[in-house]
A protein has these predicted regions:
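Conserved N-terminal Rossmann-fold NAD(P)-binding element of oxidoreductases
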Residues: 27-29, 52
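Hydrophobic/small residue at the entry helix of a nucleotide-binding pocket
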Residues: 33-34
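Conserved SAM/SAH-binding loop
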Residues: 97-106
Length: 224
């Protein structure tokens, strides 16, 4: 019988596939960025995934988030992903957590159990706290910078936080990371200047998260 990862094994070899199967990766934020990361991880054969997000699928997610469909509308994203992962690789172990990671909730996580951490959160204080906790535990981490109001997918690159430019989120991260003693941090960011938007949005944009501190969401698309 053909193994579903047969073509992946051609590239990584049996030992590489075994490492992926034994790996435990935590993805913090499973929206536009984190969602595609989860998809790639499960299709590559990663054995255990921790999904951390307290958001539910909403209408404005449909333009870019892989988990967003009319069928998943209103569901917690981590729950919808758990079901999707099971349909792709039933042997994968999934730990969905309906919680917003931040300085107030960070103590609820044991980072020593992770082999790798992906930061796809959009809150600066949470991103910095995540970087601090991962580095304290000696766990590799990559942090996603801003993709809102961007149109050029070729402008993205992986580099160190302190080598970034242009990105407003990276600028804010640099300031806070220096204060927390973070000397280096692998990030993916875009060299493209953010656009201002060609037209106002139809209807209310900020539907992803309710409560105080709501802000106008940036423009987004499925290819950046």
């Amino acid at each position: 019988m053909v193994d579903q990862f047969a073509r992946t094994q051609v590239q990584f070899g049996p030992d590489g596939m075994q490492r992926l199967y034994q790996a435990r990766v935590a993805v913090f934020g499973v929206g536009g960025v984190g969602g595609y990361a989860v998809e790639a991880l499960v299709r590559s054969g990663v054995g255990t995934l921790d999904l951390i997000d307290d958001d539910k699928v909403c209408l404005t997610n449909l333009n870019r988030q892989i988990i967003a469909t009319y069928e998943t509308m209103g569901e917690y994203k981590v729950d919808a992903f758990a079901r999707r992962i099971a349909s792709i690789n039933p042997e994968a172990v999934v730990h969905p957590r309906r919680i917003f990671f931040g300085p107030q909730t960070a103590d609820q996580f044991d980072f020593r159990q992770y082999d790798y951490v992906i930061d796809a959160i959009d809150t600066v204080s949470a991103k910095v706290e995540l970087a601090v906790r991962a580095q304290e535990a000696g766990v590799p981490i990559i942090s996603s910078m801003g993709a809102g109001n961007k149109l050029d997918p070729t402008a993205f690159e992986v580099t160190d936080l302190y080598k970034t430019s242009v990105c407003p989120l990276a600028r804010a991260m640099r300031t806070l990371c220096r204060k927390r003693g973070i000397r280096q941090l692998k990030v993916v960011y875009s060299r493209e200047q953010p656009t201002t938007g060609a037209a106002p949005a139809a209807g209310r944009l900020d539907t992803d998260r309710e409560g105080p501190g709501k802000r106008q969401s940036p423009g987004s698309n499925a290819f950046v």
